[in-house]
A protein has these predicted regions:
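Short, small-residue-biased leader/transition segments that mark boundaries at the very start
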Residues: 1-6
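Metal-dependent amide/peptide-bond hydrolase catalytic core
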Residues: 7, 15, 178, 185-366
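Buried hydrophobic packing segments
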Residues: 44, 118-128, 156, 209-212, ...
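Short glycine/proline-enriched coil/turn segments at helix->beta-strand junctions
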Residues: 49-54, 58-60, 72-73, 128-134, ...
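Hydrophobic/aromatic beta-strand patches that form the interior of the parallel beta-sheet core
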Residues: 76-78, 140, 165-167, 326-328
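Acidic/histidine-rich catalytic neighborhood of metal-dependent amide-processing enzymes
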Residues: 114-185, 189, 366
Length: 366
């Protein structure tokens, strides 16, 4: 239990930790599956307003601007998400009962992904709002992140003042992810002609996809990212046929494509279409790979603090941001979407201290 001095400013970390932990326990107890986050948003909005801050709301997204907001200064966004996935099978505890053990482990659905980030960033925001910085702050607790929903951060960003940099809270063990893989899902269809399997009839649609599936398995895009590695393509679903004795006239398969920052999703799609004969449709081009330069002053500060920049294979709301961002938060990615999800209270304490050290006195480029 200690006070922490950053650039001659004393921060009461124990009080901030106590507040953060209390809010997290309350959030765990409120089910907030993607697209059903209303009660969690209500709670968080009420909590922020009780701290004397005005809030904005659109759907189940809650945000708050620092006092004395000055459009001549750059603006820093602190963002994490309040929605969770459904509880997977295998939970031995009630996912919606926050259970804290003597070793400081706090169990609950969304504790790690991304409740700990939501509450750590909120306490840091409230503290920094009481100080003078060279930037404005916006705190945003967004919804629908786990489903990349249209009602999440994407619909809020146009309502906010221009943002110049973002910290996105996701479990990274407080290491800074300076690049993140994007996602594009393709639905691919081949058409044939139905016929009876016993006779030499029809045109088998399954045979038509074989070459294309082999191409997806074997093709390597030329540009490899030093942080994210190559573009990864995986055929993950296939569907054809109605019964054993009918030649299928249609075969569809799904391709999961994880992009690196060397290509836009549109560029990948254009290249793919040159090589395959089946009809391909992209579900969306919007979940792009993201990348921030290692020379960015915030990244440089993180490195000076002993943090190690890395490339993240998992998708977050960073994909929907048009400005530079850093993904960094308490907890471990490997605990997300697992039974008996947990966070250590000590990880929240560490996160609050590291966020303050990173952001108090920071410079953000316009």
């Amino acid at each position: 239990q200690r006070q922490m001095c950053i650039r001659d400013r004393a921060y009461d970390i124990p009080t901030m930790l106590s507040e953060a932990t209390g809010v997290l326990k309350s959030l765990i107890a409120i089910p907030s599956l993607s697209r059903d986050e209303e009660k969690a948003a209500d709670y968080l909005q009420n909590y922020i307003e009780l701290q004397g801050m005005a809030t904005g709301r659109k759907g189940n997204n809650i945000w708050c601007l620092s006092p004395m907001f000055d459009l001549n200064k750059p603006t820093l966004l602190l963002n994490s998400h309040i929605d969770t996935v459904k509880a997977v099978n295998g939970w031995r505890k009630d996912p919606f009962t926050p259970t804290q053990e003597s070793n400081g482990k706090l169990y609950g659905l969304g504790s790690n992904d991304a409740g700990a980030s939501v509450v750590s960033l909120l306490q840091v925001f409230l503290q920094l709002c009481r100080t003078t910085q060279k930037y404005n702050l916006i705190y945003l607790a967004s919804c629908e992140e786990e489903v990349s929903g249209k009602g999440g951060i994407e619909c809020v960003l146009p309502e906010l003042p221009p943002i110049h940099f973002a910290i996105v809270g996701e479990p990274t063990e407080m290491q800074p992810a300076i690049a993140e893989k994007g996602l594009m899902v393709l639905d691919v269809t081949a058409y044939g002609k139905a016929g009876h399997a016993a006779r030499n009839e029809g045109d088998n649609a399954i045979y038509k996809v074989l070459e294309d599936i082999a191409w997806f398995r074997d093709y390597r895009f030329e540009k490899v990212s030093p942080l994210l590695g190559p573009v990864k393509m995986s055929v993950t679903q296939i569907n054809a046929g109605t019964q054993h004795n009918v030649i299928p006239d249609r075969c569809t398969f799904v391709v999961d494509i994880r992009s690196n920052e060397c290509y836009s999703n549109q560029e990948l799609f254009t290249e793919i279409q040159k090589h395959i004969s089946c009809e391909a449709k992209a579900r969306s081009f919007r979940l792009s790979s993201s990348h921030v330069a290692e020379q960015h002053p915030i990244v440089q500060r993180a490195v000076a603090m002993g943090r190690v920049p890395f490339g993240s294979p998992t998708l977050s709301d960073q994909a929907l941001m048009s400005f530079p961002s850093l993904k960094m938060g308490p907890g471990k990615s490997s605990r997300s979407h697992t039974a008996d999800e947990f966070i250590f209270i000590q990880e929240i304490e560490e996160a609050i201290g590291l966020y303050l050290e990173l952001l108090d006195g920071a410079t953000i480029d316009i």
